[in-house]
Amino acid sequence: MDRRLCKEIEIESLCYSSLSRKTAEISQDVLMEIFTQLSRKVSKERPSSKTTSLQLVDSTTIPLNKTRFPWATFRKTKAGIKLHLNLCYLDRDTQYPERFTITNAEEHDRNHFECLVDKTESTYVVDRGYFDYKLLDRLHNDGHFFVTRTKSNTTITVLEQIEPTHRKTTDGQIISDQHVILGGGNNHVTERFRLVTVLTKGQRLLRIVTNRFDVSSTEIADMYQTRWQIELFFKHLKQNLTIKQLYSRSEQGAINQVILTLIATLLTYLIKIELNSTATLFQLKRSFHYLRFELAEVWLERYRPG
């Protein structure tokens, strides 16, 4: 542990075993309440709506050593935990974790999707791993909007062809815009949905299904394109925050550290809002590390606008 840090906070030493023990002892209920309150505060500072935000839902597996974390085993030779996350996306510089759950890595994403969905009139952008006829019907009937991809073997019945007003998208061009029924026989949706087919610049064909009929086909394509922002968030979380190395080998300790990492992300984002800074969360976090022993004025001067 950094000796200067110990001196600044007036302790003689801080060893790995102490961090391990303390991380495991923290009440998970307390951490969840802190996360919830911070998320609400961010939401008040940067309110979201149907027209201004998207809810990006996905999961990431945090691999663990099977010998050190036997409770996290999910395959014969593998261990890990899975973070299921709802990331509120307003724009490229404005996104923050809003809801999450943590499970063993073997848990299927679909089983925990409902835990992350709580806003009517919101648009949930998800990958095709969540694609399910009953789920799409339920989301629609419960007042939620969605944007996702169909599976390659999805049966599609075209009801109506719509002529796109514009064909160029951020990552390709619109091939078709249709009103459709998905599925067939005894396995199908009960509602009419919209299917936008896109040919990407990499020559991939994406079939995007949604219940948003109020926006253009290019907007639908661009909505799905934002899904990659949650992948970048996961990458940032793993590489630049504190879940590269878990201090505790216990299940509660490991999960607590992931929650603490999400709390740190929200705190960093609140600082970004307070400063009206254009810096990324990673840039702010890095400055915390390099300027942690400097006066607050030094840090503020660096990130004060203008």
Outline where the language-model segments fall.
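Alpha-helical solenoid repeats of the armadillo/HEAT superfamily
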Residues: 42-46
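Single, function-defining residue in the core of a domain
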Residues: 12-13, 18-26, 30-37, 49-53, ...
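Active-site neighborhoods of divalent-metal-dependent phosphate/nucleic-acid chemistry enzymes
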Residues: 73
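DNA-recognition alpha helix
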Residues: 1-11
